[in-house]
């Protein structure tokens, strides 16, 4: 099981609710700038993968695509949702997990002010 908490008004939560599936992608340093820019606009208004050149590929167990070259990808199927103030906590079963140990994953530093690898 895994959980993610998303704002009630966001496009990602609406997609999860409509499909019942999502992928949690832990991306690597090659997508650092794209990951930062993704927070500057809504997926409701633009295709972020196209706009920020994020490579996608088919998932093995779910319909939504996954980010190619990620450190870790969790393919998830929604099992429950809980309202938490102005957010919704999505609880899911992990249906598949894949990854690449050679990819240096990004971490959020200073809140979300900076994304970087742990050794930077």
Where do the language-model regions lie?
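Basic, polyanion-binding surface patches
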Residues: 1-120
């Amino acid at each position: 099981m895994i959980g993610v908490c998303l704002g009630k008004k966001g496009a990602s939560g609406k997609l999860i609710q409509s499909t019942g599936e999502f992928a949690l992608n832990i991306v690597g340093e090659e997508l650092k700038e794209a990951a930062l820019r993704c927070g500057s606009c809504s997926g409701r208004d633009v295709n972020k993968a196209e706009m920020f050149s994020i490579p996608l590929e088919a998932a093995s167990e779910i319909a939504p695509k996954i980010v190619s070259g990620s450190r870790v990808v969790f393919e998830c199927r929604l099992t429950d949702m809980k309202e938490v103030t102005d957010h919704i906590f999505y609880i899911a079963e992990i249906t598949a997990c894949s990854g690449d140990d050679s990819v240096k994953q990004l971490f959020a530093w200073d809140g979300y002010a900076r994304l970087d690898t742990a050794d930077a």
